[in-house]
Design a protein with these regions (language model features):
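N-terminal positive-inside, membrane-proximal cytosolic segments immediately preceding the first
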Residues: 1-27
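Short solvent-exposed coil/turn linkers within tandem alpha-helical repeat scaffolds
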Residues: 75-84, 98, 112-121, 147-156, ...
Length: 202
């Protein structure tokens, strides 16, 4: 009798809760395999991006005719991918070497806008500021180097800020920026020493 009662209880339990249990199991399996698919898809995407990065950087180094267009397309289609951001940095360097500053600005700006890693974003910001200075877009460059950056880039940013302020004729502010560069750990290179000396003389 006890066994029969247990069976009946199981039947009643299953009748009341069976659909929910099945649904839970199905959802559980769905989530499990969904995450497995997501992980696999993510891995495959990263592997393709890595392969494209290696190919494109090699082509840029070799000066391939189609390298710039292919790199621009890759960066445009994958702005948040780290490999695409590395390609953008390489593309910008390639463009600067060929005095194509507009292409360099576009590539670096994409990294500044999309990079989730603060160091990647900071590196792109410093490089972009240098290109903007070369284009005489001093206000735009100044806004980049004055924004909060990781400590490792503070010295570079302060020196660039000094360069911009000196170019704008703000001697006292430029000197203060160079001093901050030294305090941030930037080495007193001959170039930085010359900049400070020129401000003293002026």
């Amino acid at each position: 009798v006890d066994e029969e009662q247990q069976v009946e209880r199981l039947k009643e339990f299953w009748k009341e809760h069976g659909k929910g249990i099945v649904a839970g199991v199905v959802i559980g399996f769905g989530l499990f395999y969904g995450w497995r698919y997501y992980d696999q898809h993510t891995l495959e995407t990263q592997e393709r991006a890595s392969s494209n990065y290696q190919q494109l950087t090699a082509e840029l180094s070799e000066g391939s005719e189609n390298a710039v267009l292919e790199a621009q397309e890759f960066v445009s289609e994958n702005p948040e991918n780290v490999y695409a951001q590395l390609v953008a940095l390489q593309l910008a360097q390639h463009a600067v070497e060929r005095t194509d500053l507009a292409t360099a600005v576009t590539a670096l700006q994409s990294v500044v806008d999309s990079a989730q890693d603060e160091n990647m974003s900071a590196l792109a910001s410093i490089r972009l500021a240098r290109v903007l200075i070369a284009q005489e877009q001093l206000d735009a460059a100044l806004s980049l180097v004055k924004k909060p950056l990781p400590e490792a880039y503070a010295g570079f940013a302060a020196e660039l800020e000094g360069d911009i302020l000196a170019e704008q004729g703000n001697t006292e502010e430029a000197r203060a920026a160079y001093e901050r560069a030294l305090q941030a750990g930037e080495s007193l290179t001959p170039a930085l020493q010359m900049k400070l000396n020129s401000l003293v003389k002026s």
